[in-house]
Amino acid sequence: MSLKQGNPTMKEVATEAGVSLGTVSKVINNIPVGEEYRKKVEDAARKLGYQVNNYARSLRTNKTNTIALIIPNLSHPYFGAIANAIAVALNRRGYSMLTSISNSDDEGEQRCLSLAMEHKVDGVIAMTYNPRLEVGPQLNFVTIDRFINSSVPCVSCDNFGGGQMAAEKLMELGCKRLMFMRSGTHIYGEPDKRIAGFEMACKMHGIPYDTLNLHESEGLAPFEAYLDAHIKEGKADFDGLFCNTDRLAMVMAGQIRLRGCRVPEDVQIIGFDGIRDFISGGYLCSTIVQPVELIAETAVSSLFPQDSSDIKPLIALPVSYAFGGTTKG
């Protein structure tokens, strides 16, 4: 006797369950039927090993229950945390996630978007750095941290408020001369408001400050040169440092210690993101914490608003300060 190959058909499921083909179709497509009929179909499908052909169903319903996430990379802890939180938020709604890595490249982002559209996804969430990204008007599209235009919802944290919070926390902890360091892309995004909030707080309180704003491609050398010029014989001419990311804050803490300064006794440092240590669960450094889960939940909700009047072009979610050992409190 030969075994039948391939996935059983809906007709075979209907025969096994003793119901009509239409009833099987309703159960598979989540259309309400009597509980008795639903159980018969589910039991028959399980017995026969029937698997839903999602591609065929998407052709009928014009819906794939898949959302694409376009993200620069997964090596940065914040990007990894956001990707995980979005996957959780989508899973709660019965959606799968197609992840595409753009490497912060304009052409790469456009390819990622084209790939997502080829897969007939129901929407796209993107952390994009491409000012010329071509987005079709019919595509459900939400960005994180980069405002494109008023028709595309952008979800971010309160970056301006976070910069202000960091400066004022350093002042509260006794710092008298502050420094801001940034490493990032050349494309303006919501995170660039951190320096504006920092500068406003310094000016408002009459605190002297300096800034070093660099492109990530420049590497560590310009930061090292700055520290060499401003730390002499173990004494720095600044006592409070705010970095635009936790990762940069940790690198600078190491570089400052190499030059004979103590952290936090001589120089207090605050980062931004709220990245936790994988083993201990504590914060890597004192930091302005982004509400990662709330950002993810808001981005997913913004893809499918119940009322179009609820769509906001820019949503800035609140941040908070957390101690992580690189400040005195």
Regions found by a protein language model. Give the residues of each.
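Short beta-strand elements in bilobed, periplasmic/extracellular small-molecule ligand-binding domains
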Residues: 90-101, 199-222
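An alpha-beta-alpha
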Residues: 166-209, 311-328
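Hydrophobic alpha-helical segments within soluble ligand-binding/sensing domains
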Residues: 153-180, 220-229, 249, 289-308
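Alpha-helical recognition/docking segments in bacterial nutrient-uptake
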Residues: 1-5, 9, 69-168, 172, ...
